Amino acid sequence: MAQQYQPGQRWISDSEAELGLGTVLAQDGRLLTVLYPATGDTRQYALRNAPLTRVRFSPGDSITHFEGWKMTVQEVDDVDGLLVYHGLNGQNEAVTLPETQLSNFIQFRLASDRLFAGQIDPLAWFSLRYHTLEHTSRQLQSSLWGLGGVRAQPIAHQLHIAREVADRIAPRVLLADEVGLGKTIEAGLVIHRQLLSGRASRVLILVPENLQHQWLVEMRRRFNLQVALFDEERFIESDASNPFEDTQLALVALEWLVDDEKAQDALFAAGWDLMVVDEAHHLVWHEDQVSPEYALVEQLAETIPGVLLLTATPEQLGQDSHFARLRLLDPNRFHDLAAFRAESENYRPVAEAVQELMDKGRLSPEAHKTIHGFLGNEGEALLAAVNDGDSEASARLVRELLDRHGTGRVLFRNTRAAVQGFPERKLHAYPLPCPDEYLELPLGEHAELYPEVSFQAQPDVSDDEQRWWKFDPRVEWLIDQLKMLKRTKVLVICAHAETAMDLEDALRVRSGIPATVFHEGMNILERDRAAAYFADEEFGAQVLICSEIGSEGRNFQFAHHLVLFDLPSHPDLLEQRIGRLDRIGQKHVIELHVPYLETSPQERLFQWYHEALNAFLNTCPTGNALQHQFGPRLLPLLENADDGEWQALIDAARGERERLEAELHTGRDRLLELNSGGAGEGDALVEAILEQDDQFALPIYMETLFDAFGIDSEDHSENALILKPSEKMLDASFPLGDDEGVTITYDRNQALSREDMQFITWEHPMVQGGMDLVLSGSMGNTAVALIKNKALKPGTVLLELLYVSEVVAPRSLQLGRYLPPAALRCLLDANGNDLSARVAFETLNDQLESVPKASANKFIQAQRDQLAPKINAGEAKVAPRHAERVAEAQRRLAADTDEELARLTALQAVNPTVRDSELVALRQQREQGLAMLEKAALRLEAIRVLVAG
């Protein structure tokens, strides 16, 4: 039955104790609304099972008024459901304090209440609570928090960008890495770190419709982010007054949003902290006219504090289009296209001078003059040191120039040339005779490029008797190729789902080669199973056959043989296909196998990609521009042209490609590349993450957590476990992920090849959710144990108290970094002396044995009068350490923010991309954080009573 709630009553959240005291605002039907004034948060709960505990103090308790004065309770009245406390204040005067006027920061002394009420927990739970506090503290202070838990190999430039961007207040940046460098992972890392730190709590992701599924898979698989995909159907069917308010992370197709004004209104009303826009280069802007998509994103960017734009490289975009993206981020700074062009031209010689310094290690007189003109007299000493061969001075000079870079803080652009670490590509072409059955096919959209689809679609063709794969020579070739490669993993990609499914049938019927298929008609779970079957080295499929759309968002870097069963109609799609294997971190040469039908449009398309665009052996940053320029001539010539016409087109396109590539190379901005790559900072993060991966602390901790909650674990295979709820499962809300069970691994490499396994890190929802269940409830906050130590007289009682320094503040202030909930131990002997400095927790723990609950309860009741004053005395013992900890937290917070303010203020003087709002927000955060830390209080977290035996 639902509890009786009255407006004004004070309750505390069982799952979010850090919110402070809550005040009931309203009870409406089946919903209860509670305000938490300390943080400004409001929560709605289902009335039947609200995770709340009534705050009710007893005579003898000390309580605090919201104005700060204290009183000792003598009597409690219940007036129409509201509690009224009567007692004495500090001046020994009689006072009355209604619960509505209680301080929002009051702690709830739950541990002592439970101990004396006979609610004594198993001994192992007390240790679990202590270790949970320690691990939580360590993670909150870690520089890797939000960076190490992604299901991906740690890569330096991605980690550098993620930390640099995510640690800003309301970041507004352009991510413009070249293809294959992982812009989506960078954006996901920024989102993940901002969510974990509390800098953002509501995120909007706008993408082209065809990329929605890819983003959904990436966010869920790599980051464990439960993104809600919104389309017209979901929006219309929702019962909520504003469907967007029901989710923290919304994934929305821009095409639908532009056409639906009602959805736009709801989106604006929902309020967001961070907006991510993929494929932002497709937003069309001209000085005199903008597209509806650009106008909508511009309006959103005016109201949403943080904006991430993912786009093609500036060189691919052209200067005008590049300016249009920057204008979305900071319209005050980038308001005049002509001024932007002039500024870019003025900066080019400086970038060229830096290129010279990087390549030759010294500056020519002309380069020296250029940099001196840019830095002014303040750069003279630095330039002199550079000329003397001082390498440290060279690094400082580059940093000075970086700080002054016109777009260095808002634009991140890494290139393959700068990053390195990509595999070589090898092309194997297989011309095959075109079968007669394809020669008489009716013409259609790209019918000659995908003849099997057109053939099978003919009304007079029987699916069972006349299958295209019985005569198409590419199928026989594929079977022979797979047999030659034996058990080597091979990825096959084709344009259509029908072709993929037919190929699987063909391999099963004609060869018995183990194969699996991957297409857009399958749900995520089915695709996971197919990917896992392909990844399994021992019993898995040799070949995975993917359709174009079905393979989006999936990378199979453990394979290095790629069969392009047909060719796509656009070079970007070709690059996407090759990119399934050709990613940074791939350890093998990419073997590209391309069968095509001779004297058909397939042969000509192969020649176009290979001879004109060079798109097989290298990435093709100019492909989109060349397709746009030559596309109208290309399509007719694919089907019908003499050799002379065709060769002329190939030659013209090749010449234009070489010209554009030369332009791109000379336009390379080495300063920007240095800034985007992190100049070595990312490498340190990679090393730290790999070191953390090798530690055993997490598996050891999780084993104790699983034991406590009744989760059974058994070996699945090497580096993998199967988790299942046991009959004794303690809490059905434990975030196992699946009621039937789940397979997990702590091994990053295993997780990368087996997407059906959960990759367990400190950031995983199972770990975080389990830790929250321990700390937000009362689990393990009382225990009684027998201590076996010959130095102690039998019957001696020791009292171990765990306190935490608690600060109630909005998560966005990130005060947990400075004042984490590490346990402050106090171990009191019979004389009230604190022995904690001499007896470590683990040393003590090893000497303890459990006591039957009934015996423990009997002992506590007998010792209540002796224990209660000792518990009250414990706080005074740890108060000096608490005060030191708070002072140190304030010092570190002030030092960090002062340093960042000084850096940004100096930077603003030479680089206008530092926004005033950023400095104002940082100052406010400093003052607010220091004030909140001043109010930090000690909270009794757990009590363990030890009896010598």
Curated annotation (Swiss-Prot):
GO terms for biological process: regulation of DNA-templated transcription. Residues 164-332 form the Helicase ATP-binding domain. Keywords: Activator, ATP-binding, DNA-binding, Helicase, Hydrolase, Nucleotide-binding, Transcription, Transcription regulation. GO terms for molecular function: ATP binding; DNA binding; helicase activity; hydrolase activity, acting on acid anhydrides. Its EC number is 3.6.4.-. A motif (DEAH box) lies at residues 278-281. Interacts with the RNAP. Has a higher affinity for the core RNAP than for the holoenzyme. Its ATPase activity is stimulated by binding to RNAP. Transcription regulator that activates transcription by stimulating RNA polymerase (RNAP) recycling in case of stress conditions such as supercoiled DNA or high salt concentrations. Probably acts by releasing the RNAP, when it is trapped or immobilized on tightly supercoiled DNA. Does not activate transcription on linear DNA. Probably not involved in DNA repair. PANTHER family: DNA ANNEALING HELICASE AND ENDONUCLEASE ZRANB3 FAMILY MEMBER, SWI_SNF-RELATED MATRIX-ASSOCIATED ACTIN-DEPENDENT REGULATOR OF CHROMATIN SUBFAMILY A-LIKE PROTEIN 1. This is RNA polymerase-associated protein RapA.
